[in-house]
Every structure is written in structure tokens, then in C-alpha cells.
Amino acid sequence: MLQPKRFKFRKMHKGKNRGLSCDNKVNFGSYGLKSIERGRLTARQIEAARRTMSRSVKRQGKIWIRVFPDKPITQKPLEVRMGKGKGNVEYWVALIQPGKILYEIDGISEEECRFAFKLASSKLPIKTIFVSKLVL
């Protein structure tokens, strides 16, 4: 699973997920999967989508993951009374704003890429669209 190797503080405030994403252009590959909704992706969801894409692409193309889960989500155990401090870190999430590029692919045809991204988007809890790199 994806998670930071080192971090300054183990636990974080919940915070807000406002604004639009700056990572809205395809940088590395030819095609990208772009979010059009706000939400959170867990490390498991990111990995599940990556696996489905890599199975679909096989060994032809190259896949880039443009999101990283760097926010810890804590949870208290079941049937524990309130108080006594914040719970333990249960999993890690990446906060997603509209317009963020989640994955990129290069080295395969557009039809294969669309099919791979369709499979990957079914594993994700947010709505996404297919985008291609603008070549001028």
C-alpha cells in the first residue's frame, strides 16, 4: 500500500477539501484520467485501479500514478467510550479536487487507453473523464 515513509506528525486534523486542483494537465503520458468531483481516495482504491489498468495494458504501455495518499485517517476501536484521545491511524487518503489528473498512460492506442481508464474508474469513488495531451 502507498503511505509516507516518514512524517512529522502521526495524526492530522480533518480539515477542508476546497478549491480546484493545479495538477490539471497531462505531463508525463499521452492520455490521462481526470477527476471531475471532489473526494478522497484511499491507498487501497488507488492500488486497485492501478492493478486493473496494468492488467488491461499488459506490458505495452507505461502508467504513472499522479496522486499519493499523504493524509492519515484515524478511527477508534468498536465499543469504546468517547474521550481518551484521538484514535489510531487506520488508513491513508489522498484529497482530490475537481480537475486533478489521477493517472497517465503512454505507449498504447487511444481505444486501449479508454478501455483501461474505464475499468479503473469503476474502482474509484469519484467521477472521472478521459483527457489527452494537447499537442500544438
Swiss-Prot record:
One CC-aspect GO term: cytosolic large ribosomal subunit
The keyword Ribonucleoprotein is annotated on this UniProt entry: yes
Alphabetical list of SUPFAM superfamilies matching this protein: Ribosomal protein L16p/L10e (SSF54686)
Domain of life: Bacteria
Quaternary assembly: Part of the 50S ribosomal subunit.
Job of this protein: Binds 23S rRNA and is also seen to make contacts with the A and possibly P site tRNAs.
Protein name as catalogued: Large ribosomal subunit protein uL16
Organism expressing this protein natively: Buchnera aphidicola subsp. Cinara cedri (strain Cc)
